Amino acid sequence: EVFAEMGDVLAAGGAWVPGRAIPDYSPKQESAHDAPVLSTENLSFGRGAALGVGINLDFYPGEVTALMGPNGAGKSTLALTLAGLLKPIAGKVLIADNLKPAHAGREPIDWKSKELLGRIGMVFQEPEHQFAANFVRDEVSIGPKSMGQSQDEAYQTADRMLEQMNLTRFAKANPYTLSGGEKRRLSVASMLAAAPKVLVMDEPTFGQDFTTWTEMVRLIAGARDAGCSIIMVTHDEPLIEALGARRILVSEGE
């Protein structure tokens, strides 16, 4: 009854209203799938005991892949492994040969952290794990500066991302003072600003109202359409549907 009487008002304020249409940001055309940007070869991953063994996967430019499965199955651990932040127990994670750094191999786990910039980005389940600046605007500008933009150019990129994520008013705030949902939007904005070829995200839409959720989905779709391969751990079924994502079920021990 409340939703029937106040649905439009609640929706205008960003509330999730039952029956409200979910925007469609699925790809307009099938990806060519000429060559994967990231692959696994007989990958076994985990922290100590293996959570998954013998995994062979390919991830393509311009594609969104959803890692799904029950809690404890190892989705976040797999995400960290794919992002080059956790060493495989066995097997390999390999980036496309044309994307590897000069004088480096194809395995991201062997790279220096600065070599990941512009190649592989990671949005952590706990956003605070990636904050490195004292101010929100500076946080978003780190990636663009590291990619060669001047300070003015990096700030322009940061300002654009903050506006799109509805975070402009927090530009001079400390990232740790933001709410949980705001921190998550900041972490996504920071990674998108660096324009990586592969973006791994752990529960990117958690804690968002409908308005900020929709804007985040739009930005993720934009990165996909620009050729980024996006891999996301999520339980968000509307997100998967809105992006037309490929689904991979992660099940412990398989």
Where do the model's predicted regions map?
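H-loop/switch region of ABC-family ATPase nucleotide-binding domains
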Residues: 234-235
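ABC ATPase C-loop
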Residues: 191-192
